[in-house]
């Protein structure tokens, strides 16, 4: 367990939740360690917590605290030295013409409708496919840290259609002291698309432009098919036994 006795983390308290069904491994129970009080967790403290394996969901800052299981491994991409592989290059070729717009956190009905299509198309029956506007807002639009929404739109090359273009993807990210943190991304559930991969590549490019060394992808679970893609970005680092360990691309 990472030590949390360094200032300013001494001002925080940490408690463990009751067990609840694991979202990633069937037949498993999960627990989380939650950092409180929330009003003290501003951008600087949150940046420190992320380096120690914490994430946030809305206003809650947490990390896995499961009994007898350590499958969730924090993973961050090392921006300096990153080189895309063939499949990642194909994602850029497929989606590289998407136009982006960065927004402060705000409710946009078009985003919410895309979110519902994504949940129903990619995670039907997962419990989020019928989220209300309030649930969506609490999950994605509440933050005490430096957060942004990023729109990705497909625009007609001819410009004949006018307007902002067709919304294809929305990403929520946090700006940390040492990188970007990919909080959540949802997109049009089209067959043979690579929106998720392209989004990570876009964040790597943004981090490089901002001279930030890392892109945090949250938790990687080696035995979860949903999480396998995270380990495909090299070099990356994983947090084990309280220390970050580098993983380079296999030869």
Swiss-Prot record:
Has the keyword Transport been applied to this entry? no
Entry's Gene Ontology BP terms: ubiquitin-dependent protein catabolic process via the N-end rule pathway
Q: Which UniProt keywords apply?
A: Acyltransferase, Cytoplasm, Transferase
Q: What Pfam families is this protein classified in?
A: ATE_C, ATE_N
InterPro entries per record: Acyl_CoA_acyltransferase, Asp_Glu_LeuTrfase, N-end_Aminoacyl_Trfase, N-end_Aminoacyl_Trfase_C, N-end_Aminoacyl_Trfase_N
Q: Which reaction does it catalyse?
A: N-terminal L-glutamyl-[protein] + L-leucyl-tRNA(Leu) = N-terminal L-leucyl-L-glutamyl-[protein] + tRNA(Leu) + H(+); N-terminal L-aspartyl-[protein] + L-leucyl-tRNA(Leu) = N-terminal L-leucyl-L-aspartyl-[protein] + tRNA(Leu) + H(+)
Cellular-component GO terms for this entry: cytoplasm
State its Enzyme Commission number(s): 2.3.2.29
The protein's GO terms of the molecular function aspect are:
arginyl-tRNA--protein transferase activity; leucyl-tRNA--protein transferase activity
Chief localisation class: cytoplasm
Q: Does the keyword Transferase apply?
A: yes
Compartments reported by the entry: Cytoplasm
Q: What enzyme category does the UniProt record give? A: transferase
NCBIfam families, per this entry?
A: PRK01305.1-1, PRK01305.1-3, PRK01305.2-3
| Record-stated family | Belongs to the R-transferase family. Bpt subfamily.
Q: What does this protein do?
A: Functions in the N-end rule pathway of protein degradation where it conjugates Leu from its aminoacyl-tRNA to the N-termini of proteins containing an N-terminal aspartate or glutamate.
PANTHER family assigned = ARGININE-TRNA-PROTEIN TRANSFERASE 1 (PTHR21367), ARGINYL-TRNA--PROTEIN TRANSFERASE 1 (PTHR21367:SF1)
Q: What's the protein called, per UniProt?
A: Aspartate/glutamate leucyltransferase
């Amino acid at each position: 367990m990472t030590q949390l006795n360094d200032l300013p983390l001494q001002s925080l308290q940490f408690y463990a939740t009751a067990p609840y069904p694991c979202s990633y491994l069937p037949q498993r129970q999960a627990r989380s360690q939650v950092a409180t009080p929330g009003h003290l967790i501003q951008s600087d403290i949150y940046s420190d917590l992320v380096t120690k394996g914490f994430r946030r969901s809305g206003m809650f800052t947490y990390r896995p605290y499961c009994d007898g299981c350590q499958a969730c491994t924090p993973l961050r991409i090392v921006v300096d030295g990153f080189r895309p592989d063939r499949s990642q290059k194909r994602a850029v070729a497929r989606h590289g013409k998407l136009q982006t717009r960065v927004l402060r956190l705000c409710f946009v009905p078009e985003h919410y409708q895309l979110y519902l299509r994504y949940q129903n198309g990619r995670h039907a029956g997962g419990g989020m496919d019928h989220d209300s506007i309030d649930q969506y807002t609490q999950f994605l639009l509440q933050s005490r840290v430096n957060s942004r929404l990023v729109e990705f739109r497909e625009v007609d090359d001819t410009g004949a259609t006018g307007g902002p273009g067709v919304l294809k993807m929305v990403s929520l990210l946090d700006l940390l002291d040492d990188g970007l943190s990919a909080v959540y991304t949802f997109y049009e559930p089209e067959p043979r698309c690579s929106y998720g991969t392209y989004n990570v590549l876009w964040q790597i490019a943004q981090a490089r432009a901002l001279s930030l060394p890392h892109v945090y992808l949250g938790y990687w679970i080696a035995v979860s098919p949903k999480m396998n893609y995270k380990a495909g970005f090299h070099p990356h680092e994983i947090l084990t036994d309280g220390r970050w360990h580098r993983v380079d691309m296999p030869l």
